Curated annotation (Swiss-Prot):
Family: Belongs to the glyceraldehyde-3-phosphate dehydrogenase family.
Residues noted as binding D-glyceraldehyde 3-phosphate in the record, renumbered to the chain: S221, C222, T223, T252, R267, T280, G281, R303
List of residues binding NADP(+): R80, I81, D104, R149, N385
Something else known: Plants contain two types of GAPDH: cytosolic forms which participate in glycolysis and chloroplast forms which participate in photosynthesis. All the forms are encoded by distinct genes.
Keyword annotations from UniProtKB, A to Z: Calvin cycle, Chloroplast, NADP, Oxidoreductase, Plastid, Transit peptide
Enzyme class, UniProt record, top EC level: oxidoreductase
Stored PANTHER family: GLYCERALDEHYDE-3-PHOSPHATE DEHYDROGENASE 2 (PTHR43148)
Residues under site feature: Activates thiol group during catalysis: H249
A single Gene Ontology CC term: chloroplast
Protein name as it appears in the record: Glyceraldehyde-3-phosphate dehydrogenase A, chloroplastic
Residues of the active site: C222
EC number(s) reported in the record: 1.2.1.13
Amino acid sequence: MASATFSVAKPAIKANGKGFSEFSGLRNSSRHLPFSRKSSDDFHSLVTFQTNAVGSSGGHKKSLVVEAKQLKVAINGFGRIGRNFLRCWHGRKDSPLDVIAINDTGGVKQASHLLKYDSTLGIFDADVKPVGTDGISVDGKVIKVVSDRNPANLPWKELGIDLVIEGTGVFVDREGAGRHITAGAKKVLITAPGKGDIPTYVVGVNADAYTHADDIISNASCTTNCLAPFVKVLDQKFGIIKGTMTTTHSYTGDQRLLDASHRDLRRARAAALNIVPTSTGAAKAVALVLPTLKGKLNGIALRVPTPNVSVVDLVVQVSKKTFAEEVNEAFRESAAKELTGILSVCDEPLVSVDFRCTDVSSTVDSSLTMVMGDDLVKVIAWYDNEWGYSQRVVDLADIVANNWK
């Protein structure tokens, strides 16, 4: 019986002489890896540098248009994504967005404190302070803070809100998100998978199809944003027949710190003590942005005791015979062209903490790419499920502004 062939990518392969992916705002050379420093102070300095630099080099370049309408933006839900979004937006130069309001039930003191001090991101390099009982100041810009759990009651009409960043994870269907429209907002961008007929867009994959006619849209999930760009490359270059994926995902606020009641019996268990298998719709959701892959992908999630950064493990059968180096070169080519700022390729033997605050949606770990036989492909891709995702939310909001009529 003939033995199966097996190929593993060689880590020595370089792209354009670079041994590491281009993280926006960071150095390109592998001799100066920005994450090689070990102290937390150095990491927090790095975050500060990235946040300041992302305006000039971060984000999806295709979405930047000089003369876009500046939209009045409100953030509904000032949790992990809400605060990451504000930091990402604050770092952009010449943004077509103007954040003027936040709906948060915790009050201005808590909102300003948690924005300034973050256990994952470090201290925000901005002057942040409460303004009275209904506002926070960020580098002198006052943002109004309101508090109401029902979006229909929010003062969006009074404030002239054009776009709401829906970050609660609660109002994800047309009825719920539509309450913002009822309150006077013109459009809603959901920072989670949408339900029902809400259009889903992933920057770098199908966001070019957005039109001004869409009043409520979804930015999909962080995992779909990681998965879809490199799946698109695989399908275009090699033809995906079928596949499965596992995301090893940092724990989130939906889990329990200690064993406690939860509708998901596994998520009811202590997040910091367990590997928690659970469901994810990320693989199936790829079909929402790449319709040709409907019914071809499925997957699960393993929630692990880390606070941030996750990694996708995708295994697919392809129709075109290939080998590991060819797969990686396809990723490099796309990362240098149509997926610049969205996809990157890393040749260094790194671990999850090294990918904190990376601006791209997914970073393929080239040394872990494998091909069994000549048609079974395994790809590993890292993603910052908070920061990287929030950069895409800003990008998609920019696209909304650039298509405003």
